[in-house]
UniProtKB/Swiss-Prot annotation:
Name of the molecule in the record: Uncharacterized protein L265
Entry coiled-coil feature ranges: 38-69, 201-229
Top-rank taxon, per record: Viruses
Keywords: Coiled coil
Length: 325
């Protein structure tokens, strides 16, 4: 097959005939640039030698190829003659086993899929659901409370709350949001809750709970009157100021603490400066009064008199005014 294609190529045939006629033929012999390059020249020489060897070995390759093709054709004809009578009997006997083999292959394929699925299931992370241990204890406590309440008949522990009504109103609001007025065709659709006379109109229970609330308020008012008497005003004021300072020191923010501390320092410095200026003014006034002879140094209040509680500053100022007149 390939030999025919090779023989049909005219350019290759011309090249082969030319190379056979001219055994000393060197490609690119007239190209001086290629001939001056040593590497290219060596490669060309090797190529020429390999080509000559192939040309010499071509008859052997052709004979081998022809022998192989003849042997294959002979073997095929012999096999066809031998296998013709056996194919009919073998096909009938092989149909059933082949079907079984196909079924086995399909089964094995499905088993491999199931095995892959099992591996994936094994490697999947599973959530571990743990039982809440507090449920049993809380249920037992609630059950005991319920039994005690039923035995005593005292339902005062159950306090009425507005939580159920809030839930009902919230659900109704969610139903009404985003709907037009035309949606509500009947006034009954706007009813949030209907009063039940047996439950909501229980006046006895309402009056009993009202009395309990009023008694609790009276007790609270009495304790407040005893604790916060007008006579103990100063005491409570000190306690209040102490608590205020404690709360202010405890409840501070770390970010603004330094700034607030600096503000306090500047405030006290300003107050100290004002006090020093007032003291200096006071000293200047006293010095001028003494220099003018209005009062003498002996008449000034001493440190002992200033520390005493019975010193009457207003009286001293009046005496100074009288002396000045």
């Amino acid at each position: 097959m390939y030999q025919n294609f090779i023989g049909q190529n005219p350019m290759l045939n011309q090249f082969n005939t030319y190379s056979q006629q001219n055994p000393n033929f060197i490609p690119f012999h007239n190209n001086q640039l290629i001939n001056n390059n040593v590497h290219v020249a060596n490669n060309l020489n090797n190529f020429v030698q390999q080509h000559k060897q192939l040309q010499n070995q071509m008859p052997q390759f052709q004979n081998q190829f022809q022998n192989q093709s003849m042997n294959q054709s002979m073997n095929q004809s012999m096999n066809q003659q031998i296998n013709r009578p056996m194919n009919q009997s073998m096909n009938q006997s092989m149909n059933q086993p082949m079907n079984k083999i196909g079924n086995k292959i399909n089964k094995s394929h499905s088993e491999n899929k199931s095995a892959k699925n099992i591996i994936e299931e094994m490697l999947k992370p599973q959530k571990i659901v743990k039982d809440n241990k507090d449920v049993e204890s809380s249920y037992k406590n609630r059950n005991k409370q319920h039994e005690n309440i039923l035995k005593k008949g005292d339902f005062s522990e159950f306090k009425l709350t507005n939580a159920p009504y809030k839930v009902i109103i919230k659900d109704k609001i969610n139903d009404y949001v985003g709907k037009n007025i035309d949606h509500f065709k009947k006034p009954e659709q706007l009813i949030v809750h209907k009063a039940d006379p047996k439950i909501d109109a229980n006046t006895d229970r309402f009056n009993a709970e009202l009395e309990l609330k009023e008694s609790d308020l009276e007790k609270i008012n009495e304790t407040l009157k005893l604790e916060f008497k007008p006579e103990r005003y100063n005491e409570h004021k000190k306690i209040f100021e102490h608590k205020e300072v404690y709360i202010r020191n405890m409840a501070y923010e770390a970010k603004t603490f330094d700034d607030n501390k600096q503000d306090y320092i500047e405030f006290y410095r300003q107050k100290q400066k004002e006090a020093e200026e007032g003291k200096k003014l006071y000293d200047d006034i006293i010095r001028n009064i003494i220099d003018e002879g209005i009062i003498s140094k002996d008449e000034l209040p001493t440190e002992n008199l200033q520390n005493e509680k019975d010193v009457d500053i207003d009286k001293i100022i009046i005496d100074m005014n009288l002396d000045y007149q």
